[in-house]
């Protein structure tokens, strides 16, 4: 079964090297849908709490909200950094409070302080799906991601090979030590009983 959560993201980008209107800097409101698949966790009677999917995903997705997303070889990128530096906002501003976790992967790098994401490839709906899956695949059992932006849409299905160990008290994934990061419940494999962490 699947738990499904959606996010709205406002961002600006352009298709560097593209022949058409998208070569100009422009903005979108995109809708990202993440479907998490697993068995129903008997303790909480759900696959995965949607509010916990939102918290887990939003930690990295907020880097894309109200952000400028440019390809790493886009010649406008140095000019943007220069203007941000002249404005004194390259390293952050007092009112930039919605910063996500910085990340650097093969596909993209986030600069949360200045609301900038630099990508390896042009930021299309397909590209966004690749980046999001890469960032979240170890945190959630993602079965499908759909991203719509303007009149563009793409979706991709992913194989979910094994069940994720989850807390029977609140339904979220256990950490590498078998402890729930939210309530402290511990998976005690030796006795088969769960108990609060000490």
Locations of regions flagged by a protein language model:
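Cys/His-coordinated zinc-binding microdomains
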Residues: 171, 184
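Extracellular calcium-associated, cysteine-rich motifs in secreted modular proteins
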Residues: 187
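Processing junctions and N-termini across compartments
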Residues: 164, 174-177
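Short Cys/His-rich "knuckle" micro-motifs
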Residues: 176-179, 190-193
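Cys/His/Pro-rich metal-binding microdomains
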Residues: 168, 181
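Positively charged, low-complexity intrinsically disordered regions
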Residues: 166-167, 190
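Charge-rich, low-complexity N-terminal segments
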Residues: 1-164
